[in-house]
């Protein structure tokens, strides 16, 4: 048995009767384990699994079986922080090794806003974070097992853990067939163009920008194979990977956008706004990049987003650091302007208060923030749910990382609803904005292998 060296740690654990769960922190260096094998082995746990991989691979975490969840119908930072504290207080955490580096985390986030959601989002709460029974840190090759003390068999626990890890290692990958697309259609395309036209007419010196999203519906001949999607999601390394099962629904995102992360007292975020198509010809690509870096409209849009984000985090920080000129972010299908921003946080800063303040950024909502958010609630077709919403990892301390759920889709049994949006400003053309959203559908169409060739130059400078 590969974990034999951990037996002494198991034998020396003294159970704390005041704690409801025992969480074991276990090394798995000796096991050859990846995302596909984990999802294959735990195929019967559908509806209670997630995978969160950050863009720079700081996190690559898979969670299986939500053993405990914290949720609320409204996002109130203080109450959410209290719920997190109460959940972690239920846990007796024990390390089966001296050199373990990972930290137990919860996965989840909030919906885009508190607007009453339509039926397709019924599986998700307004605020929700999950503690899984099995949590695999594939970056550090470590695993956490959380088990209710009423279900513990300490004598056979090490053998059970080794059996699961060995079973994952030898799991035979199945469900290799791609989903067969039955139909593909835009939802209310003409109405959406009229909505854009109406928004342009409503914009003024006070109401400067609003981001409007639309949807595309894909139906399949049979149920979409989740393991096939996991394989496809592994193909693109320059974005976040978010795969979130809850009940009968699965939310998937390949977003390029970090909302923010905290490590110790340092907050890191990015202002991302301004985009242009990436093409196959290298010379044309250079023209595209040069255009984006010098285009006044894109630079203005980027500057507005950056200034808004900086303004949001100033109350929580003791100092800020960022460059005045944006850099170029290269993704598989598109280029973005982005500015990295770092802040040293005040000692009493709280990740949920920061989340409440910074979301939604102007890149996914508009300006001014509250006016744009209200306009979206009142006029946009359907509800956003987890689209453009914050999703990520939180720890017992305030360390965390949140991404923005862009380039995304919601999958049910035989259909997928894709989401994309664009920023509407004075002078926006409805037809051009409609075509712009086609570019942003491409990552999810590619995951489903239902690709489109309708790629073109961005006109709105918005990363949604």
Predicted stretch roles:
Residues 1-75:
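An N-terminal JmjN-like helical accessory module and its immediate linker preceding a catalytic domain
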Residues 62-66, 217-300, 320, 359, ...:
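An anion-binding catalytic pocket shared by soluble metabolic enzymes
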Residues 341-464:
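Conserved hydrophobic core element of enzyme catalytic domains
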Residues 173-258, 302-305, 309, 316, ...:
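Active-site pocket-lining segments that scaffold enzyme catalytic pockets across diverse folds
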Residues 2-3, 85-217, 318, 453-455, ...:
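Non-catalytic accessory segments adjacent to catalytic cores
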Residues 50, 107-108, 241-245, 384-392:
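A short glycine-rich, hydrophobically flanked beta-strand micro-motif that places a catalytic Asp/Glu
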Residues 1-5, 140-168, 261-332, 412-464:
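Cytosolic ligand/metal-binding cores
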């Amino acid at each position: 048995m590969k974990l034999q060296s951990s037996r002494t740690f198991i034998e020396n654990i003294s159970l704390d009767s005041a704690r409801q769960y025992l969480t074991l922190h276990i090394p798995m260096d000796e096991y050859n384990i990846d995302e596909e094998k984990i999802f294959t082995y735990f195929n019967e746990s559908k509806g209670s699994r997630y995978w969160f991989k950050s863009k720079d691979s700081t996190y690559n975490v898979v969670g299986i079986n939500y053993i405990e969840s914290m949720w609320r119908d409204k996002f109130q930072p203080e109450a959410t922080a209290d719920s997190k504290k109460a959940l972690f207080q239920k846990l007796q955490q024990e390390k089966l090794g001296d050199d373990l580096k990972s930290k137990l985390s919860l996965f989840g986030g909030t919906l885009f806003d508190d607007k009453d959601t339509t039926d397709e989002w019924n599986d998700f709460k307004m605020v929700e974070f999950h503690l899984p029974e099995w949590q695999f840190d594939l970056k550090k090759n470590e695993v956490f097992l959380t088990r209710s003390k009423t279900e513990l068999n300490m004598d056979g626990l090490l053998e059970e853990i080794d059996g699961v890890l060995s079973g994952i290692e030898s799991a035979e990958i199945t469900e290799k067939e791609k989903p067969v697309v039955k139909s593909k259609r835009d939802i209310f395309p003409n109405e959406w163009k009229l909505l854009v036209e109406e928004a342009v007419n409503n914009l003024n010196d006070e109401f400067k920008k609003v981001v409007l999203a639309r949807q595309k519906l894909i139906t399949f001949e049979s149920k979409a194979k989740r393991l096939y999607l996991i394989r496809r999601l592994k193909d693109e390394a320059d974005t976040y990977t978010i795969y979130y099962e809850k009940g009968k629904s699965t939310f998937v995102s390949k977003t390029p956008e970090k909302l923010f992360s905290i490590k110790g007292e340092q907050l890191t975020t990015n202002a991302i706004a301004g985009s242009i198509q990436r093409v196959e010809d290298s010379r044309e690509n250079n023209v595209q990049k040069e255009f984006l870096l010098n285009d006044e409209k894109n630079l203005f849009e980027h500057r507005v987003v950056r200034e808004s984000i900086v303004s949001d985090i100033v109350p929580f920080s003791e100092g800020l650091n960022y460059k005045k000129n944006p850099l170029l972010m290269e993704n598989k299908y598109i280029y973005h302007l982005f500015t990295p921003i770092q802040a040293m946080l005040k000692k009493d800063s709280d990740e949920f208060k920061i989340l409440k303040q910074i979301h939604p950024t102007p890149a996914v909502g508009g300006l001014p923030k509250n006016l744009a958010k209200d306009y979206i609630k009142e006029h946009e077709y359907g509800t956003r749910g987890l689209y453009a919403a914050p999703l990520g990892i939180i720890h017992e301390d305030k360390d965390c990382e949140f991404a923005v759920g862009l380039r995304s889709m919601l999958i049910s049994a035989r259909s997928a609803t894709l989401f994309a949006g664009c920023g509407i400003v004075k002078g926006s053309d409805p037809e051009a904005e409609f075509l712009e959203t086609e570019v942003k559908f491409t990552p999810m169409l590619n995951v489903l292998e239902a690709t489109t060739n309708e790629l073109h130059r961005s006109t709105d400078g918005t990363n949604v």
